[in-house]
Design a protein with these regions (language model features):
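Conserved lysine of the Walker
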Residues: 16
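N-terminal phosphate/diphosphate-binding loop that engages ATP/GTP or pyrophosphate donors
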Residues: 24-76
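Phosphate-binding P-loop
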Residues: 1-3
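Hydrophobic anchor at the beta1->P-loop junction of P-loop NTPases
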Residues: 8
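Hydrophobic positions on the alpha1 helix immediately C-terminal to the Walker A/P-loop
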Residues: 19
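Phosphate-binding/switch loop-helix module in NTP-utilizing enzymes
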Residues: 70-113, 117-123
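The conserved Walker
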Residues: 12
Length: 170
């Protein structure tokens, strides 16, 4: 069976998570089993005030991060992350099995550059444990992610700003 790595890329607030939410709906309609995590923003009007995470397949909702009132420089400069929940999500990713698709929203500099955060997400990509993996990432990190991906993966780049057809994932 062919192994697929779908890289969903776009800048901050470009629609990566919305694309993944549409994929979740599609997979439910088709009876496709999904594991992983999506991270929708928490909004107060036009202001993003936090980040939630929804764990699949259970659909458990956890509140991952809140905006820092006066953020400093660094990889997660805008957000104060709950470290216990980061660990919980990382463990969840490491414990996944029997999924048609694994979804990871998102892998960022913390994982790719610092090798911290959701390190089990990187293991999924490096080992080709699953046949179909969907990863959200910013454009500046795409080439690094491709370099890390297991050689058995066929890589498909999905740029959300080009309004891709959700069925590309099937």
């Amino acid at each position: 069976m062919e192994k697929n790595l779908y890289i969903v890329c776009g800048h901050s607030n470009a629609g990566k998570t919305n694309f993944l939410k549409e994929a979740v709906k599609l997979f439910k309609e088709k009876g496709i089993t999904l594991g992983g995590v999506i991270a929708p923003g928490v909004w107060d009007g036009d202001e993003k005030t936090g980040i939630d995470s929804i764990l699949f397949p259970s659909e458990e909702l956890v509140h991952l991060a809140v905006r820092k009132p006066d953020f400093s420089e660094g990889y997660s400069r805008k957000w104060k992350f709950d470290e216990k929940l980061m660990d919980k999500i990382n463990k969840h990713l490491g414990d996944l099995s029997n999924c048609d698709y694994v979804m990871i929203d998102e892998i960022g500099p913390l994982e790719i550059i610092k090798k911290q955060g959701f390190t089990n997400a990187l293991k999924i990509i490096e080992t080709a444990k699953f046949d179909n993996v969907i990863v959200a990432i910013r454009p500046s990190l795409v080439e690094r992610l491709k370099d890390m991906a297991h050689k058995d993966y066929k890589i498909t780049l999905i740029e959300v700003d080009k309004n891709p057809d959700i069925n590309i994932l099937l």
